[in-house]
């Protein structure tokens, strides 16, 4: 639930309903791997491994993103202020994270060439983004959590997670 209604996503697309049951917005399309991520105010519905993403807030669809070429969505997370972190396979990188503000404008893109980006989340204050990465050194897999200020493409902090596989991420 959002403060203004409920969003569902399925193989038939994404639907936004008001708290009174009124149909507020929808995106009807075939979705292979439907995923929904939500905060108190905003929901993002997307097709993991594909190219379509939709953001719902305040009773309407507020933003949409369609990747092109061989770029595909891996994850998308939204904070309570409506800022969005999109992790994607992007040509020329092992992974990339793009942060969008609450108006759908791109703030920063972080391209990673030596490790894979698997997930990301924007801080509650919209000042930084946490990025989960995976890589391999001398045959051993490793994970790291990288913290980036939104005005820098180099991390300000790095947390080595060893061989742990991160299954979920929240920036509180």
Where are these regions (language model features)?
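Short secondary-structure boundary micro-motifs
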Residues: 19, 27-29, 37-39, 82-83, ...
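Short beta-strand elements that form the blades of beta-propeller/WD-repeat-like
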Residues: 1-10, 14-16, 35-48, 52-55, ...
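A short beta-strand motif characteristic of beta-propeller blades
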Residues: 20-28, 60-67, 105-111, 154-160
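Asp-box/WD-like beta-propeller blade repeats and closely related beta-sheet repeat scaffolds
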Residues: 62-84, 88, 94-95, 102-119
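Short acidic/polar, Gly/Pro-enriched loop/turn segments located at secondary-structure boundaries
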Residues: 11-14, 19-23, 30-33, 50, ...
């Amino acid at each position: 639930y959002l403060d203004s209604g409920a969003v569902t996503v399925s193989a038939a697309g994404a639907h936004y309903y008001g708290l009174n049951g009124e149909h507020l917005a929808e995106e009807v399309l075939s979705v292979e791997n439907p995923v929904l991520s939500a905060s108190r105010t905003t929901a993002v519905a997307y097709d993991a491994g594909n190219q379509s993403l939709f953001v719902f807030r305040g009773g309407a669809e507020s933003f949409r993103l369609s990747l092109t070429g061989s770029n595909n969505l891996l994850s998308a997370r939204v904070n309570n202020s409506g800022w969005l972190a999109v992790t994607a396979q992007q040509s020329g990188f092992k992974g990339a994270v793009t942060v969008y503000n609450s108006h759908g404008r791109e703030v920063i893109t972080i391209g990673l060439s030596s490790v894979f980006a698997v997930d990301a989340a924007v801080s509650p204050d919209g000042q930084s983004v946490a990025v989960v990465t995976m890589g391999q050194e001398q045959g051993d897999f490793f994970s790291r959590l990288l913290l980036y200020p939104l005005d820098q493409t180099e991390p300000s902090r790095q947390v080595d997670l060893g061989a742990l596989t991160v299954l979920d991420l929240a920036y509180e």
